[in-house]
Every structure is written in C-alpha cells, then in structure tokens.
Amino acid sequence: MKSIKRIGLCISLLILIIFVTSCDGDNKITGDSKEEQIKKSFAKTLEMYPIKNLEDLYDKEGYRDGEFKKGDKGTWVIRSEMKIQLKGENLESRGVVLEINRNTRTAKGNYIVREVVEDSDGMTHNHTKRYPVKMENNKIIPLKQIVDEKVKKEIEEFKFFVQYGNFKELENYKDGEVTYNPEAPIYSAQYQLKNSDYNVEQLRKRYNIPTQKAPKLLLKGSGNLKGSSVGYKNIEFTFVENKGENIYFTDSVYFNPSEDKYNY
C-alpha cells in the first residue's frame, strides 16, 4: 500500500514539473537554442541591412509596444562609430548619431569626435567635440560652419554601416560564444570572422584600420528577446582588444518613442 502511495506521489510530482515547465517555456531559453534565439532576435533588425537611402526610414515601421503614445510614428536612431587606440596613445572615436523622426520627417544629430585621456593618477577624462548635422537627400550636412577641413570632409563622405552592411549570411555563423543572463536580461553571441567576410572588407574600404587581424563579431543586446522598445541591440567588430590597445567598430539601429531623450 505504501509503495502504491509513493508511486502515485512520484507521478503527481512529475506531472506538476511538466506543467510548470511548459507554462514557463516562453520566458526561458534552453541550452541548445540560446544561440539560435539570439540570432533570430537580431535578425529582425539585421534583415533591414543595407538601407542605401536613409530617407526610406521615414516610411518604415519598427517594433511598437506600450511605450509608444497614440499617434506617435516613432523615431529611428542610428549610430556608427570607429574607435582606435594604438599602444601608448589615447583612445579616439569618430562617428555619427542621427535621429530620424517619422512624425516631422526630419533627421538631425551630431558628428562626434571623442578622445579618452588618462591622467597621472590613472583617472580617465573624455574630451568631446560635437558637430551638429542634419540629413537631406540622403546626405549628412553640417548645421554650422566647420573650420577643420579634415572633419568637414569626414562628414561629407560619411556613410552609416546600415547603408552598406549585409547580414544575409548570419545563419551561416556557427559555434558562437553565447552568454545569456535572464535576470538583467542581457544576451550576446560572438563569432570569429575572416578578413574575406563581406562586412570586414567594407569596413576596411572605408576606414584606415591599423591591423591585419581579422575581427570578432559581437551581437550584444538587452531586453526581451522577442522584442521591446526598452533595451538595446549593438553590433561590434572587434579587431584588437588589449590593455592600452583597442580597435573596434560599433553600430546600432533603434526604433524608439519620439519623446525619448538620447544621450550622446
């Protein structure tokens, strides 16, 4: 009789475990599917690449949730930035952040030059210069007169990575280093690329990258894997990552409520 009761208890516990697991399945990522679900989450954004004409974003809808107010068409925020620190030198970054407002059909932002300097006490300080810009006819145009001819030329020739990047081969990236923290939630997948990779070749055409090392591609995001206007999704190509020596390129495309304020 006791044996029958024990068997019945075990069966009941087993049924309960199966029920709880199935109910919670949508919020959990199984070990075998982490990489695949992260790639699928990024694919929703990366499938847009390339957008050769950024003005197409005025008519392109993004992911919407309860954070958007009624009637708000949303704002696309795009950013591309190259960061280089050679041995014995300061870290310097150059890039553009652009807010493409679908309500007003205007696009404004900044060309940003930033230098990170370390003082004698080991404290770091950011020296940042911002040059206001706008987009018209798919071109980045300074809003103020620029004396520095180098900066002026960089702005005139600037292209966002989303305009020439291509991730059609994303599914072919295999055996990535995957991390996932469901409590934050934060997730990432990293892949070793070759210099023959299309996106690597495109970056080398546009930037003077002082190394022949092939980069690693890092897909890093936060928020709900299924989609959310709260959180971020960043792409990073890391060529060199050492103490006192860093070379990497970052890119991001967000779709957010227009009233959100952006710090850059």
Swiss-Prot record:
A lipid is attached at residue 23 (S-diacylglycerol cysteine). It comes from the Bacteria. The keyword Lipoprotein applies. Residues 1-22 form the signal peptide. Transmembrane segments: none annotated. InterPro entries: Csa (IPR007595), Csa_sf (IPR038641). Keywords: Cell membrane, Lipoprotein, Membrane, Palmitate, Signal. This is Uncharacterized lipoprotein SAR0444. It comes from Staphylococcus aureus (strain MRSA252).
